[in-house]
Amino acid sequence: MDFGAMMFSTDYSIRPDDLARLLEDRGFESMWVPEHSHIPAERSSPWPGGDDLPQDYWHTYDPFVALTAAAAVTTDLKLGTGICLVIERDPIMLAKEVASVDRLSGGRFIFGIGGGWNREEMANHSTRFRSRWRLLRERILAMKEIWTQEEAEFHGEFVDFDKMWAYPKPVQRPHPPILMGGDGPTTFDRVVEFCDGWMPISGRSGEGTSLQEKIVLLRRQAEEAGRDPASINITIFGARPEPDAIARLEAAGVDRAIFGLPSAERDTVVPIIDECAKLI
């Protein structure tokens, strides 16, 4: 099993390039950064993680800028979005950003995506909450055309463009791995149709169904759709840095465990990284 670490990289935390060096030096496989363009000062959308939304949600750097800084000082560390809010981004520009980071990193980018939870944030981007999943699907399919075709063309409900040239193309072919976040009733449909893996948050697998059972269901659905079940990567966000917890994840069929790090300065973060590194 591979191990990664995630942090809301902010203006008051350890720099993303410094964090990347620390992780690579200690044998971590990957580094992950989340995304929020902003947080509306007034909102009714509940945060899935609890009552009070941490301020790092509105202080976080742009993920592609942070990961480019990380790429510049590392050679093997994989670099992922966890997750990118595709529904808040223009797909033509996003396709270029993904391909650019993948090329500048030498093919180390992992594209974690999701639909988000903050209705007010989405509304500021002119995205309708109820249609966000249809929008996400089209944008991903359109980006795949841009990444894989010399003259890309796409005509859908939300995304529409005639033949065009768009470079760079990603190093990884046909494109960087796409991992779907979330754990809703239709998540597996999206994973099987247009993604390369599933990336749920630890402890949110739903009542009555264990993580291991869900992984079995996902692999079965993939097989029924004609896909190789082994090609579906399982990545767990927010894994508990404890030997027993890691052993349970591995037994369940998890391919990658990602530890959460606080958005804090270097002196606070380094001891936590060192403790997590003992599990690698």
Where do the model's predicted regions map?
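Active-site-adjacent structural elements that line small-molecule/cofactor binding pockets in enzymes
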Residues: 1-280
